[in-house]
Structure formats: structure tokens, C-alpha cells
Regions:
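A conserved structural/catalytic subdomain of Rossmann-like adenosyl-cofactor enzymes
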Residues: 1-167
Length: 167
């Protein structure tokens, strides 16, 4: 599960450190959250080369394969769509280095340390420039939030003097 790649506890961190001392992390593939439908786990696949210590300059691949071409259908569970085969092939082509210009939203190649989260989401930086509509929506959301806070007596959070004795 994804939680094993995060390493929150001391024990988890020690395990990750021990793994890299003896094995090379080649990459981690984050899977569709519905892969094990109704089980309640976020699955991933970690790929290692056994018996070779992980070198500090070794780049590992972190792939977001949550959109794998499978969908949950009512009364059927997880069902393969017509896109699944192409998505699987694209994953394999990226993994094998046959695709050089992959989007960072799909795959990131980077060096790792035992203290890092070994997940695509840890390394991914959204490099897309927001549209004007995205900006306007963010401003509208903020103004709605601020108005709501002020009307509920929390104007002091925004530097306003109010009847509540704050600010």
C-alpha cells in the first residue's frame, strides 16, 4: 500500500533505510484507488533490483497510473475500458525509456533518499500555468470565504475591528 512508501514511523523509516542499503529502488507505480474495489487501500507497486545497494545518484521512476483505463461499474465492480490496453502500453513504454517526452503529471525521474516519500505525488510539481478562469475562481473562492468569516464574527482574522473585542 501507499502508506508503506511514506514511512511515517521510526520503524518504517528504518526499514526504508535498510532496504536501500541492500537493494536498488527502480521505481514506484501509484495505482488506481479502485484496483482492489471495496477494500479501502491505496495500492502501489515498488520495483527493486535485489542485492545491489542503491546509489545516491541513481534516478528512480515515479509513475502516477491512477488513470489506468479501468472504471467501477455498478453491480459489476472494476471493469476494463477500451482505453486500458493503450494506457498499459504507454506505461510500459515510459518505464522502458521508449518515451522521452512524458508529462511530469504522469512520470517523474529523480534521485531518492530513505527519508523521502517514495511516491509520484511527493516529487510532482504542477508546472501548468493556471488559466484566467482558474485565477478568477480562486479569487471568488477566497472572497466567499472571507465574507463568510466576517459575517460569522471572525473579521478580526482579516484585521477588522469588531464588536468581539479583537483586533
Amino acid at each position: 500500500p501507499v502508506s508503506a512508501m511514506i514511512g511515517k514511523t521510526k520503524e518504517d523509516k528504518a526499514v526504508k533505510q535498510d532496504i536501500l542499503k541492500k537493494h536498488t529502488l527502480e521505481g514506484v507505480i501509484s495505482l488506481n484507488k479502485d484496483t482492489f474495489y471495496r477494500v479501502g487501500t491505496n495500492p502501489c507497486i515498488a520495483i527493486f533490483t535485489a542485492g545491489e545497494p542503491h546509489q545516491a545518484d541513481k534516478k528512480a521512476k515515479f509513475i502516477n497510473f491512477e488513470d489506468d483505463g479501468f472504471e467501477v461499474k455498478k453491480h459489476l465492480g472494476l471493469v476494463e475500458t477500451e482505453r486500458a490496453k493503450d494506457k498499459r502500453q504507454y506505461l510500459l513504454d515510459c518505464w522502458r525509456g521508449k518515451v522521452a517526452d512524458f508529462p511530469s503529471s504522469f512520470m517523474v525521474e529523480t534521485t531518492v533518499e530513505d527519508t523521502d516519500e517514495w511516491l509520484h505525488s511527493f516529487y510532482y510539481y504542477n508546472d501548468e500555468i493556471p488559466t484566467e478562469a482558474d485565477f478568477m475562481n480562486s479569487i471568488a473562492d477566497y472572497l466567499t470565504f472571507e465574507f463568510n468569516m466576517i459575517t460569522h464574527g471572525k473579521g478580526y482574522l482579516f484585521g477588522q475591528k469588531g464588536g468581539d473585542g479583537n483586533a
